[in-house]
Amino acid sequence: MGALPAHLQGRDVEFESGSGSKLRGWLIPGRRGAVVLMHGFRVDRRQMLGRASFLSEAGYGVLLFDFQAHGESPGKQITIGYLESRDAQAAVEFMKKSCPREKLGVIGLSMGGAAAALASPALEVDAMILEEVYPDIERATENRMERYLGGWARGLAQLLIMQLPLRAGIEKSALRPIDRVGAIKAPKLFIAGAKDRHTKLDESRELFAAASEPKELWVVEEAAHVDVHQMAKEEYEERVLDFFEKRLR
């Protein structure tokens, strides 16, 4: 993993999660407002360093952490948001204790956004950004099978999903952010890539429609999966900072 980049002045942290894992991460202190960053599938907290940099520069305290079974956080298996939702809850609680007087926001990317949306009870934060989050595990699996193996493979997705209870002890009904997002009371900004083949645009629109107000949707025309910040860096940072400025300060 290595150390936190020198331009980000922070420290190593670890905290317990209801997933059964001890989560490891970096905590960067700020002047006003705090944000928890939640990475995607099969990567680690370093995926969120670009976001951490501009948020820290704007004065926000930032927590980056590894979900269970990712990076430096131990765990037996990745559960695509199920156990990770407990990690999301633990990270929010850790940040509240670390920054008790600050308003708190979340940015969840792909699986990280699913974990944030699936948390039960719903995360009690002041603002939430959900980027390219799948609405349900069926379509998430079908899209990936089609993306990597071709359209004929979509039918294999159901075989994989049928194995969830046996292999992971998870029912497919537990991996439906679309059923949980309405319980999130915080203002929400949904971000979608128009060329995303993992979470298709109509699926992002469905998830947005299921969410409670207040909410916003931003579609990035040229972006595929998880590359919104890279594709539209200046506009992304402007929109995110504006969204948090209104709600965390």
What annotation goes with each model-predicted range?
Residues F41-F54, F67, D202:
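The serine-hydrolase catalytic nucleophile loop
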Residues A52-P74:
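Conserved alpha/beta-hydrolase
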Residues Q47, I78-C99:
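Alpha/beta-hydrolase active-site loop
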Residues A183-K185, F190-A192, D196:
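Short beta-strand/loop motif that positions the catalytic acidic residue
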Residues M1-E16:
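An N-terminal hydrophobic leader/cap segment in hydrolases
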Residues L118-E171, D179, V219:
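Hydrolase active-site cap/lid region
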Residues F208-V226:
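Catalytic histidine neighborhood in serine/cysteine hydrolases
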Residues A223-E237:
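Catalytic histidine-centered segment of alpha/beta-hydrolase-like enzymes
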